[in-house]
């Protein structure tokens, strides 16, 4: 893609350009935000580094691409919410205007490079602006380990003390310290290169937890040279230092030195540029313990001998959630009109319950023919328009199921927050992770959904995790053979999201497979992940065991991007907030759903219940399988109406529809051991 690089002059924005080039993107312009008062170096902007802005004009000459700049005033960070929405007179709107101007002048602009490492504040703002302009964010440094990243930067940097004697080093990366504001750093460090600073920063990190890449504002840098500076570099002439208490600044005096750097040198440096492997070291160990499955076994036919009975839309309140399930339409023939009917019905339900759309936490989308995904997704996106209803769209699982009735193109179910409903544009009680930029970290969202959502006032932080498939994050292409690796990658992405948000306790898990031949690989992958790797690899020693039984495996018709497996589910940060022994007996005795099942003495195979408790308030998350229609009907009838059931079933089974159940038609379903069952249940109470 053709991209503009947002640059501050610092190491991160330029090092990200390096990775954009590594991933075959084309740099066509530079963009910069600077202080309106030209003599002012530091605006204390929440968003932009402005120290050293007076050198920015040189970079256009060094690289040979146009530079676009726009000024901002001091104290214009008017919207400091983590998840940004367009706000009049905020400094971010200057970035919007800058990029809009560039896009008008360069219509084939496709992407924006940004050097964010840990700052969600910066990331969400750039993503908001780019989303409004139809641009892709390229943020290859996002969530990188800082010590590892600094080591790579130093590896690619020149030896400033030996440039004359090292011809291979002379044109490499060169970033200098221009500001320090941390314990252990002072004016003597100003002007130092990254390799000179690395041991200092490592020591300060061990002693005082100083961020090695300066993500806490400990230091700022200015780049003088890089392998893609093909037309010139900045020669350091002098360093003018000044101090204000514990903050020390340097104004660099430089001279532009023209040169014609061969493209072969850049290509050589790109070849040497370290890139994170697709699998983390621990996940690489896991793949090596699995037998490799190279390809699918062949086309599988699904015979549609099913009931055309259509479950009614159900609305069920469980604790602080409203479950709106089985939204379908048969009023219209086209997929677009059916989709519009569904979202009209959903809008009416929300309106009648006085619930804004920004309170939708999670969505499950079944599509009969995945070739219609684009049409449905367009209407879905319009319904959840972030510019109207605020940031953090619902998490989502989207799969193809030919088990829907022949004249039904799509089915939608949603989970809605019913606490603190109001007319605010932003649901401030809604937390989430919505990463839209490409990186090495995990896939960006490929639709209008968040990777995860939760409620901020939930002490357990019960979180809804979007379905994850085996996409290579930096390219957003599906991983090829062996298929085992694609399955492991999908689960790694799920685990990465859980680790990032700190919600690693698994409550309910679903794995969708589009080809039954991968069933054994999925089972082994799940077993190794949950506990078996602890005994096989030191890299897994710190991981707590997960409960295998919470998994329901379902065979469906198709997955996005032709994937063979997708992992999604519900997790939480902590199972018990007030761990009080005196309360445990009371919790067990008041376990309504479990008590019902015990009294019924039913043969629910693989039954597993996880109780989440906070301040005497209990929630149950139950997984189970049933092979008797009579026992299923008894369960559906006797389960308290305050509980929400998701029923996985093949529609050829004739069942009675109930009013507190989300029906999920699938071809086949299995437990965590791979045993096939007639019915699978996920129950929340």
Swiss-Prot record:
GO CC entries: cytoplasm
Keyword ATP-binding recorded: yes
Coiled coil: none
One example of a Gene Ontology biological process annotation: protein histidyl modification to diphthamide
CDD domains: AANH_PF0828-like (cd01994), eu_AANH_C_1 (cd06155), eu_AANH_C_2 (cd06156)
Pathway the protein acts in: Protein modification; peptidyl-diphthamide biosynthesis
InterPro entries cross-referenced by the UniProt entry: Diphthami_syn_dom, DPH6/MJ0570, Rossmann-like_a/b/a_fold, RutC-like_sf, YjgF/YER057c/UK114
Entry keyword ATP-binding: yes
Gene3D superfamilies in alphabetical order: HUPs, putative n-type atp pyrophosphatase, domain 2, RutC-like
Self-association and partners: Interacts with elongation factor 2 (eEF-2; EFT1 or EFT2).
Similarity comment: In the C-terminal section; belongs to the RutC family. In the N-terminal section; belongs to the Diphthine--ammonia ligase family.
Name of the molecule in the record: Diphthine--ammonia ligase
Source organism (scientific name): Saccharomyces cerevisiae (strain ATCC 204508 / S288c)
Lineage: Eukaryota, Fungi, Dikarya, Ascomycota, Saccharomycotina
Gene: DPH6
